[in-house]
């Protein structure tokens, strides 16, 4: 403190007065009084002759700052007003107030222990500068000019703060009770953390409940954690003073808060002689750590910005498998033990080799998970499983930006701590800067969770956002919806399907919270458009707004919906928000009336809100015009209440009107998030179509059984060369896969449907897998044929090609089917409603239709190559024969390859672009008869198969009547050494 020009001291002087006449006794300084009034009003009244009473006089002393202690030891001269009275004896001297004045004329007046400024004066004058921690205390006040009061003697404490136990377990409920002996007012609660002495105000939020009744008040914290540990303060006013009661609360460190890197380790002593173990805890906790065993090892402490790590450097491999233990201890708290198991890799153990992709992976024993730290400024761990076969599995990255985690934690603590009106805008400002650095699904999830938490806080506290804060929110939303992080959305939604719905609800809530003074307000970006305005008496009738989006969108609210609000004299604010691409991130959930039909959305969501005097209104008629929309349309809104809180599309209260040929009009009777569903080519339930599919599939099953019987009779005869072997092997596996798939399809209607039925789930999985396998075997046949056509003289190894075909035919579809099951079953989107088959929405599209159509495309390309080869002129034949053979070859290729390669699935494309029933009939009939096509064109039109079948049926056993197999290569016959002539291309089609 700077040098002081003058020091003042206020004393409480206690005097016994004998035989006094009843009178008022003034203080030494008449300008000083407890409440800033005249001190002459203070008295002790003499109650009778011969009695003795005590009179307290407050004496104002002034002296130099360096000599005042010595002045106190001198004899006091009583003021003149007291000197005329009979002799007095000084029985007590108490220091009440010490004031130090600086050169600017400001006096800092501090109360001595046992005294305090009264509550009225305490609220009138500021706390002493530089003593922020005491700003809610009445121990020191700053006066600019004359000091207008003095500290008073405190009465007994009028309340008690009760806590069941200082030690609170994680997740438990904390209950603090303030028992009041006197009437208390202006009660407030604060929390001081052990590492931060700044008090944090507590308010009634999601995690905090404040109660009050006669004689007591309470504070309840619903879910305790280390972020709620510290010293709780209760500040209130009673008996004219401000009181502060404190209670210390501790929360033990939890096991999940201890980060062990690694938590388990397999090590090869030949590749590495030593290793390092880390045991990290939050910096805010007061713990010490010890490692055991610790012999011949060096332990150290490393402190980061928000954590501290106890590191053990082990220079040598232990002789056997060892468990190292990190024991964490804190005063008056139970110890916490964090074990780390070390496994020594022995000779002969299966291991994964060193790998330096992404991060450095050391030699790891099969079945163990290797761990690596996250990059700088990220929290979490990078994991990678070493499979039992010694092959590294994909990297699992759970790293999250430390700054994003900090913002999310601050938003979480706003459920009862801090000042939302200050911290919500700050978090929004910081968050929009972090979107650009998001690189993992956990980054995206934490950002969306932060916005959701902020929305809850804003709704609970009725916090109003400034235009700047709302702009930060909309900028963040625009970046989150950008296509650059679309891959993060897919991965994150696999773990949290409702995150898109929660984000939509949060943005709706925050947009509603714009201050009325900020209207009108507008914002425009690539993915977010917002327009808001105030309606007054002078506003034109109704409300209308247009957006330059695709499809073009206009929204209006008729005057009859707004008139009651405007005529009441309140300022009505209307906000229209368009979010593009967010509808793609919402779950594919549809309420009753919209089931069993795959839909698409135009890529935008319209959110309309009406607010009057801070109150949101949900009922109003909204008319929306969408331009250039085709197909069957449904006007819908996103209902957050359905599907166990995940939300879903509903058409309740909305109806569609065709305004004209190019405009579709939606009219809804409520305010929420609107969109339009496009089911461009929906075919209604058709019993005839279903019957034809069942009959065709049954015929296909019978045909496939006949085909298997034929192969059982003639197999050894027809596969005597490589080309024939490859062709008939693919056909045989196609028959097996299609037979199993069709059988499951026919039996599925007789099974109990739903996710509770295991047999239903198994049937759906088998249908998916074997139908896919059928087409992958078709692809294998096409690729083998393409090789024979393009590389005539290249020899193929039977074992290599067979292995490749098996991998392509079974492992690839198994991967598709397994991933689909893992992604969509937890979301309950795997099954078609009421059926034991794949969901007809996005599941069918992405996991079945797209792979099938891709295979059909490749097979179509092979067909084109075959046709071009057939049209190539032959040098050995004349023009007439050449033309005839070319035409015959084309017809044969079209008739055989089209059904065999599944090109009839190309009709599926027609069902996407043609809404007529004809394309659906053609598609269903042709594909249900796939097994019949394989029997006819794969077996019965093959002259070699027919010849072998006839001979087998006639009982011919002669080995000399071997069927001549014509291939695209020269070969030596099993019974003849003569060269055969090269086969024509059309013959290769049938081989």
Curated annotation (Swiss-Prot):
Glycosylation sites: 75, 102, 118, 321, 362, 484, 571, 589, 630, 660
Tissue distribution of the protein: Expression is restricted to testis and circumvallate papillae.
Biased composition (Basic and acidic residues): 972-991
Disulphides: 635-666, 654-668
Annotated compartments: Membrane
Residues in the Extracellular compartment per record: 21-694, 752-757, 821-850, 914-916
Region of interest called GPS, as start-end residue ranges on this chain: 635-684
Pfam families registered for this protein in UniProt: 7tm_2, ADGRF3_N, GPS, Ig_ADGRF3
Topology versus the membrane: Multi-pass membrane protein
UniProt signal peptide: 1-20
Keyword check for Ribonucleoprotein: no
Key words of the record: Disulfide bond, G-protein coupled receptor, Glycoprotein, Membrane, Receptor, Signal, Transducer, Transmembrane, Transmembrane helix
Database matches in InterPro entries: Adhesion_GPCR, GAIN_B, GAIN_dom_sf, GPCR_2-like_7TM, GPCR_2_extracell_dom_sf, GPCR_2_extracellular_dom, GPCR_2_secretin-like, GPCR_2_secretin-like_CS
Any one GO BP annotation for this protein: cell surface receptor signaling pathway
Gene Ontology cellular component annotations, sorted alphabetically: membrane
Function: Orphan receptor.
Stated family: Belongs to the G-protein coupled receptor 2 family. Adhesion G-protein coupled receptor (ADGR) subfamily.
Known partners and oligomeric status: Heterodimer of 2 chains generated by proteolytic processing; the large extracellular N-terminal fragment and the membrane-bound C-terminal fragment predominantly remain associated and non-covalently linked.
Protein name from the UniProt record: Adhesion G-protein coupled receptor F3
Organism: Mus musculus
UniProt lineage: Eukaryota, Metazoa, Chordata, Craniata, Vertebrata
């Amino acid at each position: 403190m700077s040098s002081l020009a003058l020091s003042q001291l206020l004393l409480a002087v206690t005097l016994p007065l004998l035989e006094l006449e009843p009178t008022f006794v003034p203080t030494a300084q008449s300008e000083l009084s407890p409440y800033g009034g005249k001190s002459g009003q203070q008295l002790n009244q003499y109650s009778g002759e011969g009695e003795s009473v005590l009179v307290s006089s407050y004496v104002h002393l002034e002296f130099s700052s360096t000599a005042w202690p010595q002045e106190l030891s001198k004899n006091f001269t009583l003021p003149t007003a007291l000197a005329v009275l009979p002799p007095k004896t000084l029985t007590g001297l108490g220091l009440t107030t010490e004031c130090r004045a600086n050169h600017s004329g400001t006096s800092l007046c501090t109360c001595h222990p046992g005294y305090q400024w009264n509550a009225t004066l305490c609220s009138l004058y500021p706390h002493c500068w530089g003593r922020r921690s005491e700003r809610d205390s009445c121990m020191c006040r700053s006066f600019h000019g004359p000091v207008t009061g003095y500290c008073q003697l405190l009465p007994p404490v009028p309340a008690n703060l009760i806590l069941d136990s200082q030690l609170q377990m994680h997740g438990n409920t904390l209950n603090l009770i303030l028992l009041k002996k006197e009437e208390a007012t202006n009660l407030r609660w604060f929390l001081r953390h052990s590492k931060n002495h700044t008090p944090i105000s507590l308010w009634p939020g999601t995690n905090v409940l404040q109660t009050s009744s006669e004689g007591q008040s309470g504070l309840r914290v619903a879910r305790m954690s280390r972020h709620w540990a510290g010293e709780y303060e209760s500040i209130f006013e009673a008996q004219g003073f401000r009181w502060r009661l404190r209670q210390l609360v501790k929360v033990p460190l939890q096991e999940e808060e201890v980060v062990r890197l690694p938590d388990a380790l397999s090590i090869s002593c030949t590749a590495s002689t030593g290793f390092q173990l880390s045991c990290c805890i939050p910096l805010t906790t007061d713990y010490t750590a010890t490692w055991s065993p610790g012999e011949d090892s060096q332990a150290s402490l490393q402190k980061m910005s928000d954590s501290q790590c106890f590191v053990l450097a082990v220079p040598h491999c232990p002789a056997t498998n060892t468990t190292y233990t990190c024991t964490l201890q804190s005063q008056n708290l139970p110890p916490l033990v964090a074990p780390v198991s070390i496994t020594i890799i022995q000779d002969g153990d299966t291991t994964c080799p060193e790998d330096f992709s992404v991060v450095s992976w050391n030699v790891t024993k099969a079945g163990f998970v290797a761990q690596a730290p996250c990059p700088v400024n990220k929290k979490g761990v990078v994991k990678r499983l070493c499979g039992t076969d010694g092959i590294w599995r994909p990297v699992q990255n759970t790293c999250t930006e430390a700054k994003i985690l900090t913002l999310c934690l601050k938003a979480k603590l706003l459920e009862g701590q801090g000042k939302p009106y200050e911290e919500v805008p700050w978090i929004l400002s910081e968050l929009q800067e972090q979107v650009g650095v998001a690189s993992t699904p956990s980054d995206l999830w934490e950002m969306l969770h932060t916005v959701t938490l902020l929305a809850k806080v804003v709704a609970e506290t009725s916090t109003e956002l400034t235009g700047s804060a709302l702009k930060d929110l909309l900028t963040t939303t625009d970046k989150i919806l950008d296509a650059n992080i679309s891959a993060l959305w897919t991965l994150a939604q696999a773990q949290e399907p409702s995150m898109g719905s929660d984000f939509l609800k949060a943005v709706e809530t925050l947009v509603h919270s714009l201050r009325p003074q900020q209207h009108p307000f507008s914002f425009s970006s690539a993915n977010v458009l917002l327009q808001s305005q105030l309606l007054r008496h002078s506003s034109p009738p109704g409300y209308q707004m247009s957006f330059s989006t695709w499809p073009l969108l206009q929204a209006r609210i008729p005057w009859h919906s707004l008139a009651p609000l405007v005529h009441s004299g309140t300022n009505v604010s209307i906000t229209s928000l368009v979010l593009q691409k967010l509808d793609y991130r919402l779950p594919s959930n549809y309420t009753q009336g919209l089931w069993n039909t795959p839909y698409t959305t135009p890529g935008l969501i319209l959110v309309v809100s009406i607010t009057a005097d801070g109150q949101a209104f949900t009922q109003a008629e909204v008319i929306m015009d969408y331009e250039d929309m085709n197909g069957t349309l449904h006007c819908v809104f996103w209902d957050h209440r359905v599907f166990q809180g995940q939300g879903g599309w509903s058409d309740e209260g909305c109806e569609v009107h065709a305004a004209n040929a190019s405009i579709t009009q939606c009219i809804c009777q409520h305010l929420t998030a609107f969109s339009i569903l496009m089911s461009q080519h929906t075919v209604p339930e058709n019993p005839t179509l279903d019957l034809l599919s069942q009959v065709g599939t049954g015929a296909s099953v019978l045909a496939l059984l006949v085909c298997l019987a034929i192969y059982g009779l003639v197999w050894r005869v027809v596969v005597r060369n490589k080309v024939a072997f490859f062709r008939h092997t693919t056909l045989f596996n196609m028959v097996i896969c299609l037979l199993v798939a069709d059988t499951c399809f026919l039996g599925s209607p007789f099974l109990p449907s739903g996710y509770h039925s295991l047999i239903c789930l198994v049937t759906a999985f088998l249908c998916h897998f074997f139908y896919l396998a059928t087409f992958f075997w078709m692809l294998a046949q096409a690729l083998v044929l393409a090789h024979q056509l393009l590389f005539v003289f290249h020899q193929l190894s039977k074992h290599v090609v067979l292995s490749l075909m098996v991998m392509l035919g079974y492992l690839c579809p198994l991967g598709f089917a397994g991933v689909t099951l893992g992604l969509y079953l937890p979301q309950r989107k795997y099954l078609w409603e009421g059926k034991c088959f794949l969901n007809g929405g996005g599941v069918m599209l992405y996991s079945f239709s797209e792979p099938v159509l891709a295979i059909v495309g490749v097979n179509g390309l092979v067909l084109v190559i075959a046709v071009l080869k057939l049209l190539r002129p032959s040098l050995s034949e004349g023009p007439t024969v050449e033309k005839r053979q070319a035409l015959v070859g084309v017809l044969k290729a079209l008739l055989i390859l089209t059904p065999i390669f599944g090109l009839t699935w190309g009709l599926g494309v027609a069902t996407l672009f043609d809404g007529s029933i004809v394309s659906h009939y053609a598609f269903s009939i042709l594909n249900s008869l796939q097994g019949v096509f394989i029997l006819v064109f794969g077996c019965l039109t093959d002259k070699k198969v027919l010849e072998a079948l006839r001979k087998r049926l006639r009982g011919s056993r002669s080995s000399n009547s071997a069927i001549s197999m014509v291939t695209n290569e020269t070969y030596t016959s099993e019974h003849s050494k003569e060269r055969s002539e090269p086969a024509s291309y059309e013959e290769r089609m049938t081989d």
